[in-house]
Amino acid sequence: MSDHGRMHSTGSEVAAPVAPDPDTEGVHPHFNRRVTSFRARRSTISDGQQATWDRLWPQLGRQARDGDEPPGPLDTDAWFGRHAPVVLEIGCGTGTSTLAMAQAEPGIDVVAVEVYRRGLAQLLSAIDRTAATEHPVSNIRLIRGDGVDVLTHMFGSASLTGVRVFFPDPWPKARHHKRRLLQPDTMALIADRLRPGGVLHAATDHQGYAAHIAEVGDAEPRLRRVAMDSADLPMSVTRPVTKYERKALAGPVVTELLWERTP
């Protein structure tokens, strides 16, 4: 797992696991019915992470689905205990960027969605560590599930100030392009969930996927491409450079793309 959130395949392209997968158990059986953008993974969390999970997950996290039942609408005001702009991050990975950006904007509530329990456990532990600091983080909530499912069922039209999708799996082989997260249907769904003036911020280090994202984003009539340094954006688009990126500075260039929801 990279520290900016991408989880890499280990071995051949993965079929459905033959035994329960502790990292995706309870998440992906339903999604065998449609093409998904995530891969099956096997991973464990430490005893310390498990203890933190047991203590904080009931308050800060929730499972998107209970079996085959679709999730219901999410009341973010009740969950966060306040009314504030909401940003949805799809595929938060280990939460390095999630935490840093939430700390920089305490007035914005961040809902971080991730399929893999290990990544969520790392983010939950990082949030817990801020409790002993001068500025404990209280504006992050976590959902374990599929991002498209969460967008479809848990958020209504014009309910989001922003959507972040950082380093989604590029699925580089042509026969797997249909598995890419940012497809025309997903772009249309994101556009519907953004309020007018809300923004979609995407980042990838795969140039082929960057071109694909740019094409499908520009083709969505309710989204207008804007520059990263545009004034009056409703949320920060200053994304922290992670350890993974620092190690890869001589490698692939990171492409960042930004769209604004039209009135």
From Swiss-Prot:
InterPro entries: SAM-dependent_MTases_sf, tRNA_(Gua-N-7)_MeTrfase_Trmb, tRNA_methyltr_TrmB_bact
A GO term, aspect molecular function: tRNA (guanine(46)-N7)-methyltransferase activity
Highest taxon above the source species: Bacteria
Binding site for substrate: 173, 205, 242-245
Sorted UniProt keywords: Methyltransferase, S-adenosyl-L-methionine, Transferase, tRNA processing
Region (Disordered): 1-33
Top EC category: transferase
Gene3D superfamilies tied to this protein: Vaccinia Virus protein VP39 (3.40.50.150)
Protein family according to the UniProt entry: Belongs to the class I-like SAM-binding methyltransferase superfamily. TrmB family.
Cited NCBIfam families: tRNA (guanosine(46)-N7)-methyltransferase TrmB
Name of the protein described by the UniProt record: tRNA (guanine-N(7)-)-methyltransferase
Gene (name only): trmB
